Amino acid sequence: IIHAGGEVVFDRREETNNWKGIYQLKPYPIYDAAKRLKRDMYIDGTFMGLSFHIKKLLPIWKGGMILTDNAEAADWFKKARYEGRSEKYYKDDDITFHGWNMYMTPQQAAHGLAMFQNYPEHMSDLGEDNGYRDLTEFTVFKNHRTIE
């Protein structure tokens, strides 16, 4: 959110922090779905981040995915994940913006696809047994607005 120019507002209210599987980064149409992976979970018109960490529902060690129904955003995400490059030969590409080196390796992708072959039809959301440290305790977030 911050790197995209948005404002982060921390909400400490119980009703906001009692989530399971998925939560929205309000007021944006962005959902963190790192603890959910099941059929028909996508919410139209949103950007939904999935995580494939070893402790998540599709444990391929690292990586993730952004679900969206916005074709323009999907094209941008594809370029952004691979240093701003298109899906062309490097010699034929014209890089128009700085991206990141965040693409999934072919081996990781193949492992994930293989795991999907036996993925359960219905999967429960993961909980967060140990919780997360309050981000407002970190110096980098001290000056952000907080709702009590």
Segments the model singles out, each with a brief description of its role:
Residues 1-40:
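PLP-dependent aminotransferase-like
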Residues 28, 46-47:
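Proline-centered loop/turn at the N-terminus of a beta-strand
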Residues 38-39, 47-148:
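Active-site region of PLP-dependent enzymes
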Residues 43:
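Nucleotide-sugar donor-binding and catalytic loop/hinge architecture
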